[in-house]
C-alpha cells in the first residue's frame, strides 16, 4: 500500500515527532487505546516506547525474543500478526501476561526499512474485539516502515 494511504500530517509526525508523539498519532488514526514500538537490537526486540500499557506488562516486554508473543511472531514472520480478541485468544500467539493490558483487538506489524531489513515491530490495540482488514494491516505496515527510517 502506498504511503499516501496515510494522511500527510500523520506521515510527517511519524518521520519527525518524538517517538511517543508519533505512536500516539498512530493510535489516534487507527482508533486504538494502547501501543508499543520495539527496535531490533542484538537479535531481540527492545522496547523503545509504549503508551497506555500497564507497568507490570511494560516490565515484561522490555526485551522480546523473536518468535515469542505477537510482536516476536511479527518479527519472525515479517508479516502482520493480529488477534481479534486478546482476552479470549487460545491460539498460543500471545503471551499470557498480555491479557493484563485489558486490550482485545491487537495488531503487531514488522517495521521493515526500504532495504528490506527488519528494524522493529509496531504494536497497536483496541479495547474491544476487532478484526483488522488487510487494508488496515497494510496501512499500519506503512506507518511502521516510516518509523523504521528514523
Question: Where on the chain are the PLM-derived regions?
Answer:
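Signal-transmission linkers at sensory-effector interfaces
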Residues: 1-17, 119
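Amphipathic alpha-helical regulatory segments at dimerization interfaces
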Residues: 8-13, 20-29, 73, 77, ...
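Helix-loop-beta substructure at the N-terminus of cytosolic sensory domains
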Residues: 11-48, 58
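Regulatory sensory and allosteric helical modules in signal-transduction proteins
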Residues: 40, 44, 56-89
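Signal-transducing coupling segments at domain and membrane junctions
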Residues: 55-57, 84-105
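A short, aliphatic-rich beta-strand micro-motif
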Residues: 104-113
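Flexible loop/coil segments at beta-strand boundaries within sensory signal-transduction domains
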Residues: 112-118, 127
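Regulatory loop-to-helix N-cap segments in sensory/regulatory domains
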Residues: 125-143, 150
Amino acid at each position: 500500500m502506498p504511503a499516501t494511504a496515510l494522511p500527510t500530517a500523520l506521515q510527517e509526525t511519524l518521520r519527525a515527532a518524538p517517538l511517543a508523539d508519533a505512536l500516539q498519532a498512530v493510535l489516534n488514526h487507527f482508533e486504538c487505546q494502547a501501543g508499543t514500538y520495539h527496535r531490533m537490537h542484538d537479535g531481540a526486540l527492545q522496547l523503545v516506547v509504549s503508551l497506555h500499557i500497564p507497568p507490570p506488562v511494560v516490565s515484561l516486554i522490555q526485551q522480546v525474543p523473536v518468535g515469542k508473543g505477537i510482536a516476536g511472531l511479527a518479527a519472525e514472520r515479517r508479516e502482520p500478526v493480529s488477534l481479534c480478541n486478546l482476552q479470549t485468544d487460545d491460539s498460543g500467539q500471545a503471551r499470557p501476561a498480555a491479557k493484563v493490558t485489558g486490550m482485545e483487538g491487537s495488531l503487531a506489524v514488522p517495521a521493515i526499512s526500504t532495504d528490506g531489513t527488519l528494524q522493529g515491530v509496531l504494536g497497536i490495540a483496541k479495547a474491544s474485539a476487532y478484526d483488522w482488514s488487510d487494508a488496515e494491516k497494510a496501512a499500519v505496515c506503512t506507518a511502521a516502515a516510516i518509523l523504521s527510517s528514523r
